[in-house]
């Protein structure tokens, strides 16, 4: 409904040495991979699907002013992989390819429609945008995710429910609005379906991780910036969104290995468990099945069986003896 039910702007408000007075929820920070769901949702709106195949192989992109060659967090490659698993495994190379397919300008349009106010001069952004190359505010970041949680409808943020005078007379009182359909419903249901699919992230994070709430469906994504300056976790149920940022107010790097899944996700998990412990379990509605006859979008047609000549190792021809032909 847009209500901000809890907000912590710093670890210790009275800690002057570490800028405790600074409210980091409204301070621009790079979001790392927690921005990937924005790009993938823009892709779903364009007609791409979670089942489509992306090639996770080292690739040089020459569309940026400088040749850009993104690397995965583990520096490895996974070959052909579904968009679903690429997002859930937080693979960087497929994410950049998805942004390339959708277009930087289209993604920025979509992000701004979700309420992000920090992008400004668009000429600053290239394909690294999908890896968190643009700064965001934690409050706006969580508000954007709320549209996914609410089947594409986003409602205005509010942190004040009622204003009374000294005698108790109500001067202003919050009334829930209908909100606005920012994201097409099925695209919102699709991104929630992907982000709540723990099995699809297990090949990187394992089945037992801090993005899981036992017995309760939850959609979540972590993020980490270069040199561990920022660690994020954003996640939601159909009725509650929570965002966590961990870092230093002076932008000093944290210790090596301080990524979102290690230091932000446990905080997010603990909050969500406590906040939801006496509430009913909610299910995410299933998205409508993909309607397309294009094998590429269905994750098919990426492999082809060919016949080779066992002697030469080359493609067999009509002149190759049958006993030397191998599939």
Residue ranges and their predicted role:
Residues 26-80, 156-170, 289:
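Short, glycine/proline-biased beta-turn/loop segments that scaffold the active-site neighborhood
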Residues 4-24, 35, 85, 89, ...:
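A penicillin-recognizing enzyme superfamily signal
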């Amino acid at each position: 409904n847009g209500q901000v039910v809890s907000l912590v702007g710093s670890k210790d408000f009275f800690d002057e040495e570490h800028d405790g007075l600074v409210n980091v929820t409204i301070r621009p920070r790079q979001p790392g991979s927690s921005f990937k769901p924005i790009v993938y949702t823009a892709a779903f709106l364009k007609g791409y699907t979670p089942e489509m195949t992306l090639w996770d192989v080292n690739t040089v992109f020459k569309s940026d002013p400088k040749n850009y060659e993104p690397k995965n967090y583990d520096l490895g490659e996974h070959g052909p992989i579904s968009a679903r698993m690429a997002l859930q495994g937080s693979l960087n190379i497929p994410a950049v390819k998805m942004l390339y397919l959708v277009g930087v300008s289209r993604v920025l349009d979509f992000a701004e429609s979700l309420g992000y106010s920090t992008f400004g001069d668009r000429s600053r952004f290239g394909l690294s945008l999908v890896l968190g190359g643009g700064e965001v505010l934690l409050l706006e970041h969580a508000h954007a995710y709320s549209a996914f949680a609410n089947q594409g409808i986003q409602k205005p943020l509010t942190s004040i429910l009622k204003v009374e005078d000294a005698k108790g007379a109500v001067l202003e009182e919050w009334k829930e609005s209908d909100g606005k359909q920012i994201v097409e419903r099925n695209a919102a249901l699709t991104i929630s379906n992907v982000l709540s699919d723990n099995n699809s992230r297990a090949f990187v994070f394992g089945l037992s991780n801090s993005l899981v709430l036992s017995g309760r469906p939850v959609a979540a994504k972590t993020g980490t910036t270069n040199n561990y300056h920022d660690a994020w976790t954003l996640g939601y149920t159909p009725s509650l969104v929570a965002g966590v940022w961990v870092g230093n107010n002076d932008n000093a790097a944290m210790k090596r290995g301080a990524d979102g899944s290690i230091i932000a996700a446990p905080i997010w998990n603990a909050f969500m468990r406590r906040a939801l412990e006496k509430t009913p379990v909610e299910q995410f509605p299933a998205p409508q099945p993909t309607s397309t006859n294009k094998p590429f979008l269905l994750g098919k047609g990426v492999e082809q069986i060919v016949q080779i000549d066992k002697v030469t190792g080359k493609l067999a021809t009509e002149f190759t003896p049958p006993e030397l032909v191998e599939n």
